[in-house]
Amino acid sequence: MAGHSKWATTKHKKAANDAKRGKEFAKLIKNIEVAARTGGGDPSANPTLDDMIKKAKKASVPNDNIERARKRGSGEEAGGADWMNIMYEGYGPNGVAMLIECLTDNRNRAATEVRTAMTKNGGNLGESGSVSYMFTRTGVVTVQKGELSEDDVLMAVLEAGAEEVNDNGDLFEITCAPTDIQAVRDALVEAGIEVEDSESDFRASVEVPLDADGARKIFKLVDALEDSDDVQNVYTNIDLSDEVLAELESD
C-alpha cells in the first residue's frame, strides 16, 4: 500500500491525544523493558532497544521513565514484570482480517479485554491460524527523506537484502526479510543515512477494499482494542482508495 497515508497502512496507529497519552507512554516503556531484557541494556549494542528509546523520546516520555525501564529490563534494577507475547486473530466488520498483538503479564486479562472490544464493535475472535495465513511478517526500516532520492536509498541497501524502497511522503520505507533488518540498518549507517525506525511488521497478502463508513467501523474497533494496556499493535488487511482517504481526512 505504498504511497498511501497512515490511514491506509495495514497497522492502524492511533492518534496521540491527551486522553490516550498515558496509555501510549505505558506501552513505550514496556517495549523498552522487554527490548533490554531480550538484547541487553546497551542501546549501542541493541538496535531494538535503541529504536524503542528513540520512539519514547519522540513521544516526550520523560528520560527518568525511559532509564528506569531500561534498567529493569537489563536487571540493573529490580521490579521487571514477566511479559508474554500473545497474538490473537479474528475478523472485524465487513470481513476484515485482524491480528491483535499483545504484550502482557496477565494472559486472562488480555484475552478478556480483547474479546470484549471485539464483541462490542462488530468483531469476533477466531482460532489460531484463522487469519494469520493472510499476513506475512516483514522487516520495515524507515529513513527521513530530506535531500535523499529513492535511488540513493536503494543503492545503499540493495546488497543488504532490501526488497523494496517505497516513497511514503516525508519518509522512505525499506522492506526486507525480518532477519535482514540489522543488515539493512548497517548498510544505511555505512552510507551515512540515519535510520528513523525499524521493526518487524505484518503485511496482508489479500486486502479488503472499504468505503468510508466501513473504514470508520474498523478504526472504532481498533481504538477500542488499543484502549487496553495489553494491546501493542493491531494489523488489518484494509485497503482504502484515495477518495475514501480524502473523505476520512475531512471528518
Swiss-Prot record:
Keyword Transcription: yes
GO cellular component: cytosol
Region (Disordered): 1-22
Keywords annotated in UniProt: Cytoplasm, DNA-binding, Transcription, Transcription regulation
Source species, domain of life: Bacteria
Chief place where the protein resides: cytoplasm
InterPro entries named among the record's database cross-references: Integrase-like_N, TACO1_YebC-like_2nd/3rd_dom, TACO1_YebC_N, Transcrip_reg_TACO1-like, Transcrip_reg_TACO1-like_dom3, YebC-like
An example Gene Ontology molecular-function term: DNA binding
Protein's GO biological process: regulation of DNA-templated transcription
Leader sequence residues: none
Similarity comment: family membership: Belongs to the TACO1 family.
Name of this protein: Probable transcriptional regulatory protein cgR_1708
